[in-house]
Each structure stands twice: as C-alpha cells, then as structure tokens.
A protein has these predicted regions:
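S-adenosyl-L-methionine/SAH cofactor-binding core of RNA-modifying enzymes
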Residues: 2-55, 61, 98
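Alpha-helical scaffold segments in soluble metabolic enzymes
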Residues: 10, 14, 88, 92, ...
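Fold-independent oxyanion-binding glycine-rich loops
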Residues: 28-31, 53-56, 75, 82, ...
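Short glycine- and Lys/Arg-enriched binding-loop motifs that mark or flank ligand-binding interfaces
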Residues: 50, 71, 77-78, 126, ...
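Structured adenosyl-cofactor binding patch, chiefly the S-adenosyl-L-methionine
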Residues: 59, 63-110
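Internal, active-site/partner-interface "lid" segment
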Residues: 84, 96-136
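SAM-dependent methyltransferases
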Residues: 125-188
Length: 188
C-alpha cells in the first residue's frame, strides 16, 4: 500500500498555511541518510519541523519530490511505518532544547554527543551481587574521577564502537589525553 500524494500535500498546505510558513519537512524512511547525534543537534536549532511518516510501502514519489526537504533513517532495518522513527527523532531533538532536561548541559556528557560513548554509571549500594563500584568514585578527588571517566569512555568506545574513535582520530578531534589512552589500549 502506497500513500497517495493529495492527502499528504493537502496536509502540508494546511500546516504551512498555504506556503506562507516555511517548515523543514523530514520524511522518515529506511532509504534516508542515517540519523546521527550531530544531525539531531542541527535539527534542534531549527524552528519548524514536520515529520512525514509513510506506512508499509511508503508514499507516492511525486509528493516526496514536491515537498520533502530531507529523508532520514534511524538505521539499517525496516519497520511497518515511520511513526516510531519520528518519535525517536522528536525525543532526541526535544532533549536538546532549553528547559527539557533538569541539567541543560547533561547531554554533552552522553554517548554520541562527541566522539566517545559514555562512561559506566553507578548508584548505591557500593556492592551489589558481588559487583562493586570502583573505589575511585568514592575518593572525593574530582581530578581522579574525571580521569577515570575519560579512561572508561575511551575504553568502552574502543571495545564497542571503534569506528567512532577511528573517525575522530582521522579528523584530528581526539585530545592529547584521549590519544594517549587509545595508544595504550592498542599496545595491549
């Protein structure tokens, strides 16, 4: 089943007030460019976004050519419709907007914001099921805690997503400390 162009175009016209209001229309499709955190950041700076969600076979190509500004995919797999990808995109964008997160700088320390995955997170108790929180996190030495977090982030990225480190290294984006940690990991 392919969605016909007229209902989609009529909806677009209503949303844009017959073209008087410019919106950035994103079609959620597995054929689109894969969503990245950098693109999420860029989209979060735009004023008016509209998501077009196909279903089953998608939408008539003519309406895509007429009104779509960008096609985005959330990964190399197929769902029955674009609704879930649109929700994922909306959530990832909204959390970057002022007032959404309690700590507005929190997202800058999370996985994929830069070129590292996030370091491991722990809560209390200090020991659970025989697994202990690393002692350094109880040390009170913020410098040591920061260094541990950086080492863990680089190590985790090296083990789970080496492609991210390789890209950052090739682009010259690694700090001196990150490069030293990476070099040490490679020498093991």
């Amino acid at each position: 089943m392919v969605m016909q162009p007229n209902p989609i175009y009529d909806c677009y016209q209503a949303v844009t007030e017959e073209g008087a209001r410019k919106c950035h229309l994103i079609y959620m499709t597995p054929q689109g460019k894969t969503l990245t955190q950098e693109r999420v950041r860029e989209l979060s700076e735009m004023d008016d976004l509209v998501f077009l969600c196909g279903h089953y076979e998608g939408v008539d190509e003519r309406v895509i050519e007429e009104i779509v500004d960008e096609e985005i995919s959330i990964g190399d797999y197929v769902l029955t419709g674009g609704e879930l990808p649109a929700l994922i995109l909306a959530d990832s964008i909204s959390r970057m907007l002022p007032g959404v997160l309690a700590n507005e700088d929190a997202f800058t320390e999370e996985s994929h914001y830069g070129h590292l995955l996030e370091y491991p997170q722990y809560t209390r108790p200090a020991e659970w099921q025989g697994r202990e929180v690393p002692d350094v996190l109880f040390s009170g030495d913020h410098g040591k805690v920061d260094r541990w977090r950086l080492e863990q982030a680089v190590t985790r990225t090296f083990e789970r997503r080496p492609d991210m480190l390789e890209a950052a290294e090739a682009a010259g984006e690694l700090t001196k400390e990150e490069q030293e940690i990476l070099d040490a990991l490679r020498s093991v």
